UniProtKB/Swiss-Prot annotation:
Mn(2+) 4 binds at E825, N827. Mg(2+) 4 binds at E825, N827. Keywords: Amino-acid biosynthesis, Arginine biosynthesis, ATP-binding, Ligase, Magnesium, Manganese, Metal-binding, Nucleotide-binding, Pyrimidine biosynthesis, Repeat. ATP 1 binds at R129, R169, G175, G176, R208, L210, E215, G241, V242, H243, Q284, E296. This is Carbamoyl phosphate synthase large chain. One of its GO terms (molecular function) is carbamoyl-phosphate synthase (ammonia) activity. It comes from Thermoplasma volcanium (strain ATCC 51530 / DSM 4299 / JCM 9571 / NBRC 15438 / GSS1). Residues 916-1044 are annotated as: Allosteric domain.
Amino acid sequence: MPKREDISKILVIGSGPVVIGQAAEFDYSASQACRSLREEGYEVVLLNSNPATIQTDHEIADRVYIEPITVEAVETIIRKEEIDAIEPHMGGQTALNLVVSLKKMGIIDKYGIKIIGTPVESIEISEDRQKFHDFLISIGERDPERYRISRSNYKEEIEKIPFMPVIVRTSFSLGGSGGNIVKTKEELKAYAEELFRGIDEDYIEVNRSLAGLKELEYEMIRDSIGNCITVCNMENLDPMGVHTGESIVVTPSQTLSDIQYHMLRDAAIKIVSGLGIVGACNIQFALDGNDYYVVEVNPRTSRSSALASKATGYPIARIAAKIAVGYNLTEIRNPITKNTFAAFEPSLDYVTVKIPRWPFDKFSVDRTIGVQMKSIGEVMGIGRTFEEALMKAIASLDIDLSYRLRLYVSDEEIWNLVRTPNDRRIFAIFEALFRDFPVDRIMEESMYDRYFIEKMQNIVDYLKTLEFGHIPENLISLKKLGISDEIIGRTCGIDPDEITRYRITNRILPVFKEIDTCSGEFEVIAPYLYSTYEDEDELPGISGFVAIIGSGPNRIAQGLEFDYGAVKAITALRKMGVGSVMINSNPETVSTDFDVSDALFFEPITVEHVSNILAKANLRGLIVQFSGQTGQNIARRIENVLGSSVVMGTSSESIDRIEDRSLFSKRLEAMGIDQPKFEVATNAEEAINKSLALGLPVILRASHVIGGRAMDIIYDYDFLVERSREVFENVNSVLVSKYLENAVEIDVDFVSNGEDFQICGILVHIEEAGVHSGDATMIFGPKIVPQAAEEKIKSIVGKLVREFNLIGISNLQAAIKDDEVYVIELNARSSRSIPFISKATGYNWVELAVSAIMTGKLEKVSVSSKGYFVKVSVFPFSKFNDMDVSLGPEMKSTGEAMYPGFTMEEAIRKSILRDIKSVFISVRDDDKPRIIEAASIMKQNGLKIYATMGTSRYLRERGIECETVYRIKDERKPRIYDMILAGYIDLVINTPEMNAGSVRDGFKIRRLCVRKGIPLVTNINLANAYSKCLSYTNIDYREISSYH
């Protein structure tokens, strides 16, 4: 069929800020879709509030709106842009839910909008669990036994359920939100009561639990005339009961019989055909022998779609977009080969393994995993065998266990970890095998298939042959199993880099194989490569190319913002006529799309794997500035292994001098640059004594970390003792620095060539200094930094550029207090704020940095902005019930949103995504004088103010009327907790107290705000900023270039 001619302008809705369950994979999907639609001559308008995405560049879409993803914004865009059609399938649950709302509110019909791809009616059937159940019955398929529990009569209805345990599910949810496995009726009643308090739906669904059955996924794609293929099937190592986003997943399935494979494939085709899917679709099955249940359908591109695309090389989102505008699978060429069509099912002659990356290194929370997602990102390993793919995925995780594999805990604890789904279960199984625990019991306790445990046994058996102090003679056999040099070195008691150096010297190197969707039957256009230890090498001629290291799995403090930099760097090299190589292990990202770079190496970002590529490919050099902390930490080691300088831009020597906080602070002192008073401590006792000498509060800062890991503002002696002991469990020295109270923190991004520099922009934190820059609410715009302070900043930047020979892009964090500028930190790399600054200024700063790296020259540019831009962070608090909401020096956010406006008030008001008519205020004594301004403004603007006794008395004494409410411990009514539950409160301002009773009360209130989705402010500066814009009504939604 020819493409549709009845539409010309298409609105693509993005997924918004990165949250758990909805991350970088949707930047990948939407970017592919936009490019695909533009190839066909359609004008593409893109809506997404996330500035860190590639899709919000004008190279991807014709018109870009970085605005709130709301009904109001979409209707404005439809009207302004005269939109013909909406593509909602590339923006995750956010976009799907929004288009369903647009349909129900009559906006789709009002403007005559066409929904391309899978119809809204099919989406509603897939997402509404009752409708989906009825649909399955109608086509002769089945889901688990189910009961619907209503809000009005849940206790009686629960009593009638004839089976336990059950799994609780909600409709239109993301990442398993609201889901839980419940074992008793009393437990279910308590959970239902809690759940109904936090959701708007009048019912929840209860299914018979299928925990323990094998879970399979089929990634399908179908066109409008009924052609349908299986892109791939995926097998979860973890059984049912663990969300597929939390499970280790292998592609293709390893343990299915041919009968089972085709039985599920036939069912998948029947389901997508019955639903009328037009585009991509993911179906999840629970397998019980030769019987099965249908668990769930995602009628859109998803996390699994991105994984399937990278596992097979089949560009699902790109193909789905073309299907959405009328093409059939038989008419669309596969862009990876150009010689085959999209109707050909991919064929794999290799194995991929995906492992999630959890944030438990940042959060001290419950590490068990289940039906709700907790992971932030994921990695994928590719190998010729399951063992090789698994071990490469483990190496890609970049956690301590990646490098040693062993878990040094008691036998009892090992069995607990094997038995209970958690982030360390795969390592506990390895440890059980090292201890010769029975395979049958390991299989029974973990419910892993015997096949996978026996493959892991192969790895353990080889490692057991290693001798301490000797490089193993069977090194090639170990490498064929994917066992990393890190694990071999640590097992043998030899520096892992010495193992890598030995291999390279003795030419024990891998070959590189191409992924082509067709098991090598056709030639590929763009090389997509993985390493393995075989004979035949398919490495293309890439001599003289420049390699960019990616940032690996998304994690707290290192996410989508760094992938943006990597992709823009590759694009810049291409513009300069320089061949580019991408090295990354993250299947969710745009950077690992097959045609972004001239050659893609899907490999772990480790000293070993990067050195292997450099040793074989004769590359011109390596750029590490766009890989977050990962590339910075391994740059010097790679050069030591290879015995040559390969890092381009700022040297690895300068990186080390900057990353070592003690050396850096001493150098600042010698240069006469102001910084907070500091001392260097080499043990816990020193840290305590030097902190007391400086005077509390202080901050303990470790070196070579990202996201302020393990940092806290320390106000009291007991906490000082506790943190000092904890921090020295992992490091040998820390910088003890005086905390600057009531200072304003700033982020300064700049590009330099070792002599000259160009400031990209200065972001001002609204909160006081002490909140991590990745979490802080920031603002950028005209004249927000005093002229005198700006001149001092420029002077400091110039000195740092020349002292450390900074070449490329860098980031300076500083604080302004009493008109003085104090340096906090320097990063000789791209920062989280570079995408934001690039979108706010309309200038490609990464391209300028790459030019400086490649030529040594720095073009002077002049940029200005007519608008103000607010950067607001998004947090994972709803996924971790035992996590406090208060912020500090250690980063907690998963993503960010940008809100632009022609005034500061408009920009800030857009960030508050609801009407505010009432506010609850409870602040500690130190903050009471500073809340007066905000409370007074809010009262003048007609807001109803509620406050706890102490705050209420303080406000009334100063002429601000408010209603007193009581804390939980006061045992009086009205209680603030009940009022929040009942919906009387629209905004909460609560600054944490330090005494135990108040801490417990405040924690419960803050957690309730998270559950109910109520805006929560824990900082007085932010409260003041909000108060000035709550009554602002002159809001408009504009194309991003109108602000430049």
